[in-house]
C-alpha cells in the first residue's frame, strides 16, 4: 500500500432517534445520526406490521396481466 493516500480511520458515535448510542469505526470523521437501529427497528424488536399489498398486486395485474398471455 502506498503511504499517505489512505483516509484516517477513527472511532465515531452513531446516535439513533431512540437515544441508543453506538460507537463505530469510520473514515467519515464525524458523528452520525440514525433514523433506526437494532434496538428500535421493528424486525429486531418483534413488532412487525403486515402490509396489505393485495390492492397493488390486483391493480398491476389488471393493467399488465394481458401482456403476459400469449
UniProtKB/Swiss-Prot annotation:
Zn(2+) binds at residues 16, 18, 37, 40. One of its GO terms (molecular function) is rRNA binding. Binds 1 zinc ion per subunit. Belongs to the bacterial ribosomal protein bL31 family. Type A subfamily. This is Large ribosomal subunit protein bL31. GO terms for cellular component: ribonucleoprotein complex; ribosome. PROSITE patterns: RIBOSOMAL_L31. Its cofactor is Zn(2+). It comes from the Bacteria. Keywords: Metal-binding, Ribonucleoprotein, Ribosomal protein, RNA-binding, rRNA-binding, Zinc.
Amino acid at each position: 500500500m502506498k503511504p499517505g493516500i489512505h483516509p484516517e480511520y477513527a472511532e465515531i458515535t452513531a446516535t439513533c432517534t431512540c437515544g441508543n448510542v453506538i460507537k463505530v469505526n469510520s473514515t467519515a470523521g464525524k458523528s452520525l445520526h440514525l433514523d433506526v437501529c437494532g434496538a428500535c427497528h421493528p424486525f429486531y424488536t418483534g413488532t412487525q406490521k403486515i402490509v396489505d399489498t393485495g390492492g397493488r398486486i390486483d391493480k398491476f395485474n389488471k393493467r399488465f396481466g394481458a401482456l403476459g398471455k400469449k
